[in-house]
Structures are given as C-alpha cells and as structure tokens.
C-alpha cells in the first residue's frame, strides 16, 4: 500500500539554507525541518547560533547539521554543497539567504563598499545557484533572496543594495529557463521590512527623521507601512519559502514573490 501524500510536507527531502544561523534564514531552516526536510544549516561566523538552529530542528523530529562556509568564496560554496550531499546522500532544496545591507548616497559610494555588497548579495547568490543546479537532484528547488526595494519600493540612499537585489530578479527569470533540463524550479522571495536584528540596526534609514526615534518606536511606525498594520516577521517569509520548496509549487517557476504585506 502506497503512502498517503500529505500536501506541502517535505518528508524525505534534503534542504540547504545559506546564512541560516539567525534571522530569516534560521526561520527558513526551522520551518523546512518542521515540514519534514533534513536541513543543512550554513553559517559563516557563529557556530553557536547555527547549532541552536540544528537543535531546534532535531527537537521537531527531523535531522540537521551545521556546516561553515563563506558564500563570497566560490570554492567554499562548492565544498558546502559537496559536504551536504555527502552527509545526507543528496540535495533537493537550496535556499540562498545570505546578504548584507547598505545605505548611502550613490555619489559617496566607494569601490570597496560596492564590492562588499555585490560580492555577497549578487555574486554570492549567482554561484550558490550555479552549484545548486550542479548538485540538486532532478526536480529540485532553487529559492533566491531578492527585496521589495529591487523593483517595488524606492528608498533614497539605497541604490547599492537595491541594485544588488535587482540582479537577482533577472537571474531568476533566466535560471528558470536553463534549469528546466533537470526539472528544477527557480524562484525568489522579495521581503519588505522584516523584524530581525538587521532590521533594528538600519530601520532609521527607512523612516524620515528616523534617528529621533527608538528602535521600538521605529518598529511600531513600520507596522503602518502595510495596510494590515503589523510588522513582517521571519516566519512570514519562511512559510512562503516552504511553499515554493514543496511539490505543490511545481508550476511556480521563474517568479519573484514580493512579501511585504502590501507595503509597496
């Protein structure tokens, strides 16, 4: 007797999430595990944070492992994917989450700052996707990280970050064509303001005169950007990522889903 298929479950799948020791990436990893996937938790600096995520996934009844890699280094991306396949015996889902934020008038941007942002947000994601394609089983999923500022929301002094994410939208469109030979779908999520430690460190830039307010006051103000009058949280993003990772999302391909509660 064949097993009953439960929609949106990920039992038997193996997922890898870059930058998943905290924030949105950690929420992705935990939700993938909650739905039955075995998860590779990638981190670059804090093994303690990554191991907490691993423990949480194991506590949900799935399996996970933390693997260090700096996705700005292509050789480390290759090694990360190789280790993931060796550890779990395959790979079905790759979520590219690692990224950095940047603010500044484009007239003041240095070459060093340009390279810092694009090396991770754009170049890093390109090569994560390349290695995902090479390592994924047929019928796999590649899910990249864009931003609502890439196209939908114009924020002053945010050109470098917005541009680094805008490239992801083009990558997704073309990658989805190229990956069809392995029946791999390629999509991205484009979050708006999402309450994480990164949000609190830079929210003053999104609100006129934001320096006059506390982090808590800025969070309360940001809730009114959405007609739903609440903040976005990592779980809001993770739930959509898990949908894109599921069999039920097979016909969603080459798309960028804006996740900002209608703010943009």
From Swiss-Prot:
SUPFAM superfamilies: NAD(P)-binding Rossmann-fold domains. Its EC number is 1.1.1.-. The keyword Cytoplasm does not apply. Pathway: Pigment biosynthesis. Disulfide bonds: none annotated. PROSITE patterns: ADH_SHORT. It is an enzyme of class 1 (oxidoreductase). It comes from the Eukaryota. The active site is at residues 146-147, 161, 165. Keywords: NADP, Oxidoreductase. Pfam families: adh_short_C2. InterPro entries: NAD(P)-bd_dom_sf, Sc_DH/Rdtase_CS, SDR_fam. Induction: Expression correlates with the formation of the sclerotia and thus the pigment production and is directly regulated by the cluster-specific activator CPUR_05433. The keyword NADP applies. NADP(+) binds at residues 24, 70, 97, 130, 161, 165, 196. One of its GO terms (molecular function) is oxidoreductase activity, acting on CH-OH group of donors. Belongs to the short-chain dehydrogenases/reductases (SDR) family. Short chain dehydrogenase; part of the ergochrome gene cluster responsible for the typical purple-black color of the ergot sclerotia. The ergochrome gene cluster produces several ergot pigments including the yellow ergochrome secalonic acid and its derivatives, as well as the red anthraquinones endocrocin and clavorubin. The pathway begins with the synthesis of atrochrysone thioester by the polyketide synthase (PKS) CPUR_05437. The atrochrysone carboxyl ACP thioesterase CPUR_05436 then breaks the thioester bond and releases the atrochrysone carboxylic acid from CPUR_05437. This is Short chain dehydrogenase CPUR_05429. It comes from Claviceps purpurea (strain 20.1) (Ergot fungus).
